[in-house]
Design a protein with these regions (language model features):
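Signature for HUH/AEP ssDNA processing cores
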Residues: 1-131, 135-157
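Catalytic "initiation/cleavage/transfer" segments centered on a nucleophilic residue
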Residues: 4, 19, 154-217
Length: 217
C-alpha cells in the first residue's frame, strides 16, 4: 500500500500502528496497492500468465521502486558495530548534527530499532542499540546523492573506518549510517517483534523534532 502522509507527526503515528509483519519503504511504486514478491517469484508468476486476481504484482527492486520527485523521507540507519557499546538516542542525534548541522533544524524523527528495549519484569534483556533518523527532504530523487555525501562527511569528521572480511577484503564503513539504505527499494523493518510472555517490549515512541519547519533542501 502506498501512503501519503502530510508530516512526520503522521509518520510517527503510523509507525505506532504497525504489526510485526509490517515494514516501510520510503521509495514508492507507481501503484496505490500492489502484491510484492521476490524478483525470482515474480518471473515465475509472469511466465505462468499472472497471479490470477487482477492486482498489480511487482518485485522489491529498482525496476518497481523509485524515489518520489517531491518531498520524501530519508533514513539514516545506525547500528553499533559488534563488540562496541551503543550510543544513546541523544548521543546519536548530536553525532549526526555534528556532521551535518542542517539536519538539526529540519523536520525529523528519532526512532529506536525494532528489536530493542525487551524486558522481563524489571529485567532488561536488551536495551538501547540501533537508531533510525527519518528526515524530510525536498526532493526524493536527490536522496542517493545526499546519502553518499553524508557518508563522505562522516569520514571527514573521523567516524569512518575499514572493515576487514574473513577473506581479507577491506570494506569502507561509517559508524553513523549504513550506506546501503539510500536506495528506494530498501525496507525499514520498524514493526514490533513478537514477544512471548513474560517478555515484552517497552520501546520509546518515535521522537518528533521540528515538525512545523520546511524540509531539508
Amino acid at each position: 500500500e502506498r501512503l501519503q502522509l502530510k508530516d512526520i507527526t503522521e509518520l510517527a503515528k503510523k509507525m505506532a500502528t504497525l504489526a510485526p509483519s509490517n515494514a516501510l519503504a520510503y521509495g514508492v511504486s507507481e501503484y496505490k496497492h500492489a502484491i510484492i514478491h521476490t524478483k525470482k517469484a515474480l518471473a515465475v508468476i509472469k511466465k505462468n500468465g499472472g497471479n490470477g486476481n487482477g492486482k498489480p504484482t511487482i518485485a522489491r527492486d529498482r525496476e518497481h521502486f523509485q524515489w518520489p520527485e517531491g518531498k520524501a523521507t530519508m533514513m539514516i540507519d545506525y547500528d553499533p558495530e559488534k563488540g562496541t557499546p551503543p550510543m544513546s538516542g541523544e548521543d546519536f542525534l548530536e553525532a549526526v548534527y555534528s556532521v551535518c548541522q542542517e539536519i538539526r533544524h529540519a523536520p525529523h524523527l528519532l526512532v529506536p530499532s525494532a528489536s530493542t528495549f525487551i524486558y522481563e519484569g524489571d529485567k532488561c534483556h536488551k536495551g538501547s542499540a540501533g537508531w533510525r533518523l527519518l528526515g524530510v527532504v525536498s526532493h526524493g530523487t536527490d536522496i542517493k546523492r545526499a546519502g553518499k555525501t553524508f557518508v563522505e562527511m562522516c569520514w571527514l569528521a573521523g567516524v569512518g573506518f575499514i572493515f576487514f572480511t574473513k577473506n581479507g577484503r577491506m570494506l569502507p564503513r561509517c559508524e553513523l549510517a549504513d550506506a546501503s539504505v539510500f536506495q528506494p527499494e530498501r525496507l525499514d523493518f520498524c514493526g514490533p517483534p513478537i514477544c512471548t510472555p513474560p517478555l515484552e517490549q517497552r520501546r520509546p515512541a518515535p521522537q518528533v523534532l521540528n515538525n512545523d519547519v520546511g524540509p531539508l533542501v
